[in-house]
């Protein structure tokens, strides 16, 4: 069907005060509420990184949340998005925290 929305995949990295503030847990909750799949994890350089996949409008909602909202006690300085592309099918069945 041509009415089906295209699926998008995007990688992200969030900079600021995003570790030790429950950022990953809130990201997982928000992703499940919005209805996207992928993953999130802390990096050794103090950022949070991951990947989001889903219908384009839902991925855009998650990108906005990762750029502006975050967890209640986080401070997002900037969020970089990369490798944004259209995919034919989702590569994950849910959204998870990686360690």
Curated annotation (Swiss-Prot):
GO terms (BP aspect): phosphate-containing compound metabolic process
Reactions catalysed according to its record: an acyl phosphate + H2O = a carboxylate + phosphate + H(+)
Enzyme Commission designation: 3.6.1.7
Keywords: Acetylation, Hydrolase, Phosphoprotein
Acylphosphatase-like domain boundaries: 9-99
InterPro entries: Acylphosphatase (IPR020456), Acylphosphatase-like_dom (IPR001792), Acylphosphatase-like_dom_sf (IPR036046), Acylphosphatase_CS (IPR017968)
Lineage of the species this protein comes from: Eukaryota, Metazoa, Chordata, Craniata, Vertebrata
Name of this protein: Acylphosphatase-2
Record-listed Phosphoserine modification sites: 93
Function (record text): Its physiological role is not yet clear.
Similarity field: Belongs to the acylphosphatase family.
Location of N-acetylserine modifications: 2
GO molecular-function terms, A-Z: acylphosphatase activity; identical protein binding
CC per GO annotation: mitochondrion
Catalytic residues (positions): 24, 42
Gene: ACYP2
Enzyme category, top tier: hydrolase
């Amino acid at each position: 069907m041509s009415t089906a929305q295209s699926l998008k995949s995007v990688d992200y990295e969030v900079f600021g005060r995003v570790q030790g503030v429950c950022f990953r847990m809130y990201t997982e909750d928000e992703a499940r509420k919005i209805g996207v799949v992928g993953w999130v994890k802390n990096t050794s350089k103090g950022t949070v990184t991951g990947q989001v996949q889903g219908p384009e409008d839902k991925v855009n909602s998650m990108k906005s949340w990762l750029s502006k909202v975050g967890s209640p006690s986080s401070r997002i300085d900037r969020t970089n998005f990369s490798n944004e592309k259209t995919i034919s099918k989702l590569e994950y069945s849910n959204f998870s925290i990686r360690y």
